[in-house]
Amino acid sequence: MTVTDPIADMLVRIKNASMRRHPTVDVPYSKMKEKILEILLREGYIARYEVIGEIPQKYIRVYLKYKGKTPVIQDVKRVSKPGRRYYVNKEEIPRVLGGLGIAILSTSKGIMTDKEARLLGVGGELICMVW
């Protein structure tokens, strides 16, 4: 099956698996997905992830994180989509839930969080928001 938005597919898989309290979820591999998962790991939204297999069956196993029985990821929102890209400059970068969540941006300096983009003074494509 062809997926038109692989990033949204990954985010929804993670959200659905965490709402059903699954310990892991598998997503097809891409470098961009791995960079986004790196940020989610660094910010404490997932426990860990590992890349499994060889191309073309390469995939990423994401180990989800919970506080008691409550999932750490409450919700995710895909902002920029293949049919409607959404770009922000450094002044327009949103604060997610007053700083309790994160926004992930693709900038000229790589994929990073909203806080890192503000510190570097760069804008870019607003990929998603996680809280």
Swiss-Prot record:
Cellular compartments per GO CC: ribonucleoprotein complex; ribosome
Show the Pfam families listed in the entry: Ribosomal_S8 (PF00410)
Q: Which InterPro entries match?
A: Ribosomal_uS8, Ribosomal_uS8_CS, Ribosomal_uS8_sf
Alphabetical UniProt keywords: Ribonucleoprotein, Ribosomal protein, RNA-binding, rRNA-binding
- From the UniProt record, give one GO term of the biological process aspect: translation
Which GO terms fall under molecular function for this chain's record? rRNA binding; structural constituent of ribosome
Subunit info here reads: Part of the 30S ribosomal subunit. Contacts proteins S5 and S12.
Q: Which family does it belong to?
A: Belongs to the universal ribosomal protein uS8 family.
Which purpose does this protein serve, as stated in its record? One of the primary rRNA binding proteins, it binds directly to 16S rRNA central domain where it helps coordinate assembly of the platform of the 30S subunit.
HAMAP family listed in its UniProt record? Ribosomal_uS8_B
Q: What NCBIfam families does the annotation carry?
A: PRK00136.1
Q: Could you tell me what this protein is called? A: Small ribosomal subunit protein uS8
- Organism from which the protein derives: Dictyoglomus thermophilum (strain ATCC 35947 / DSM 3960 / H-6-12)
